[in-house]
Amino acid sequence: LSTSRTFQAMLNEYLPNKLLKEELLKRDYILQNCQKDDSWKGGKLIVPFKASAASSVRMGKLTQATDISEDLYVRGSIDDYREAWGSMIFNHRDLVDHSGRIVEDSFLKILPDTLEDFLDYMKMVVSIQLGTGPYFASATVDGTAGGVVIVDRIDRFSLSQKVTWKGDTQAAADYYVIAIDINLNSVTFSATRGGAAADVSAYTVADNARAYTDDADLVSYQSMRDAYLSAANGGSATLHGQTKLAYPFLQAVNIPGVSWTKSNILDKLFDGYTEVRKKARGRATKVLCDYTVGGAIMKAIENSGGGGPQRGNYQVSVKGKKASLYGWDEITLNTVKGEITIVMIQEWDPDIVVYHDPMSATFRSNGFFKKRKNPEGHEFFELRTEDGYQYIVDTCLFGEMEHTKPGNNGIVYGILPANFV
């Protein structure tokens, strides 16, 4: 018998190479590129906005005093911030075997990188919610009695991950990932951590079975999808406590995308941009999309004829194309109103495209991401069991996205990924 340790005999083995691991892209475009305020200490946050401006103009005579329209001011609010907690655990035995010191040729030298990798993962989870909503994947084939579900976003699953499955009628239940087949887009689930495959046949495509981060089906951050779509098109009826249909200020331009295909993508893209420019205020200069739609856009530009930066009727800006180490790609096109930048991001879904004004939203938080500290200043919590001591490190994010100018944006909804195959 002995106390638990993670690295076991590897502690005393020679490690000339850095840890081999999957490339973890920074899938946090929304968090990285919105305005931020980290001074919110909780409580109700007031979101005041001018719902209507004075509009009384009369030709030839003065407007009667009783007939003058006034500025209309509305008081919206966010009741409190959302909480996201990320947790990691380490075994004390791993440190004891090296007398508390981490030598260079030891597997323990990966610990600092592991903490940073986990923070990147946590940012991805939050950024998905801020962009496209609380669920991160959907079933594309009905679940099986053998625990297998075919999903649309296999890249968002990891071994031992806790996942909540929920359908329109099927109640939510928690499962753990025990196997992943990248090529088949299949994930196998157990009802217990480390257990055998569980029956997940109740979760079907017809019932819109979706995968959520633990408890995200109950509480999640305000998403662009929900904020910009009208209730008729799948969004919420209210935003920051006020009814969207009561005020044009709260209404983003909604554009149906069912007719968007890989063959007409550029025409549809600019038709949508024109529609947003006609109806919206501000400058929606960013087009946010996933790589399915973004890839079709790039192919269409390359295949539209011409040479150099001139591609048929579409002119690539001198900024050209820009691939980012942070996990997104951009291509900038010239328009009659300046430039428009198409941003392809990993944490986006293929059924929506957003024409985004970067100045229209602010993420307000209490210190952004930070490790939990106890009153003694320690950034870990000590746990004692019969198997030894363990240290738990918790990272928290208290905050919420405030959409200060939703009417400046546009959203294309109902895009069919099958149209881009």
Give the ranges of each region predicted by the language model.
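N-terminal amphipathic/basic membrane-interacting segments and domains
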Residues: 57, 64-68
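Core alpha/beta structural scaffold of self-assembling particle/tube/pore-forming proteins
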Residues: 1-58, 72-421
